[in-house]
Amino acid sequence: MEKGIATTIFELLSSGVRLDAYRLLVKKGTDGMVAGEIASALDIPPTNLSFHLKALTQAGMLTVTQEGRFQRYRANIPLMLDLIAYLTEECCAGHPEQCADLRSVSRCSDAVLPPLASTCAQPEKWPITLTEISNDNHPSL
């Protein structure tokens, strides 16, 4: 991931409404939600939400599919995982024992973090790279 893409993602998520909508859609996984359900869950007017969903979709953070007269939104989870990989790719400068101590107090699931091993600072050696997972799943920002 390029620094500019990460910066754009953080700028978009600096809006409370966008952050809430994105987290809700991450929670829903591949099922996603239609816009009206999102508006109801977040207790905001659909017209207000529409603006935020459009911004997230245009940036590639959400995908949208038409279902009759409804639009179903889904979080681009591979992009989220790519961001986590970008943030952690040089964690603890290759000293996994430091990462282990820090992870023990973190609420982040080990399932989304790179394995603690001698490859800690070398994501290209992870069993399955996030680039392979997200290949063609999110547009360039």
Describe the residue ranges of each PLM region:
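Amphipathic alpha-helical dimerization/coiled-coil segments
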Residues: M1-I5, V26-K27, I77-L141
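Short, hydrophobic secondary-structure boundary micro-motifs
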Residues: V34-A35, T65, P96, A100
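Alpha-helical residues within the helix-turn-helix
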Residues: S40, T57-Q58
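Divalent metal-coordination and catalytic microenvironments
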Residues: L49, L56, Y73
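Short, Lys/Arg-enriched C-terminal cap helix and immediately downstream tail that follows
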Residues: G60-T63, G68-R69, I84-Y86
